[in-house]
């Protein structure tokens, strides 16, 4: 009788312990973006200097995992605008990340490939921070600059992606 009672008390504990699983850890990944631009009508706006061909501007990124800086997080960047070496009358544009580029303006045939207006890659430092240089040219005034970013967070085996729209004034 005592053995049956022990079995009766132990079996529920055994089944309960087999059924309880710990929840899977999901890191809290945060990406902070500082575009360092004035916001006009709800849109970050970069005023292009018409006395300069190329206008360089920096956008800052910070990656944290569970509130701590994420070192060596790998960023990829793409933009929707391109320019051509030796051609000041036209530029290239893409409507989406995977779309083909088309030309705007009086494009003279040249042998040069389109020049991107953004760096392609960057890594975060020990503070989880990095910068990306964007460099639209003066004839792009009036366009909306799209910066597509994608980050792979080292150690967390997870990534994040997003888009920043910037009005070129």
Q: How would you name each of these model-derived features?
A:
Residues 3-10:
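Sec-dependent signal peptide recognition
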Residues 12-39:
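Bacterial Sec-dependent N-terminal signal peptides
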Residues 63-117, 162:
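Short flexible loop/turn segments that cap and initiate beta-strands
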Residues 124-132:
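Glycine-centered loop-to-beta-strand initiation motif
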Residues 138-147:
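Short glycine/proline/serine/threonine-rich loop/turn segments at secondary-structure transition edges
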């Amino acid at each position: 009788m005592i053995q049956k009672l022990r079995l009766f008390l132990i079996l529920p504990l055994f089944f309960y312990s087999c059924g309880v699983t710990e929840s899977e850890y999901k890191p809290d990944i945060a990406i902070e973006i500082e575009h360092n631009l004035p916001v006009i009508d709800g849109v970050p706006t970069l005023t292009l200097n018409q006395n300069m061909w190329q206008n360089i501007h920096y956008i800052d990124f910070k990656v944290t995992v569970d509130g701590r800086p994420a070192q060596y997080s790998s960023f990829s960047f793409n933009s929707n605008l391109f320019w051509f070496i030796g051609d000041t009358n036209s530029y290239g544009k893409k409507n989406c990340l995977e779309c083909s580029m088309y030309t705007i303006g009086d494009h003279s045939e040249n042998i040069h490939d389109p020049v991107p207006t953004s760096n392609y890659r960057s890594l975060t430092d020990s503070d989880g921070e990095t910068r990306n240089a964007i460099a639209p040219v003066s004839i792009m005034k009036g366009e909306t600059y799209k910066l597509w970013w994608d980050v792979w967070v080292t150690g967390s085996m997870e990534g994040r992606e997003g888009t920043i729209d910037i009005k070129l004034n």
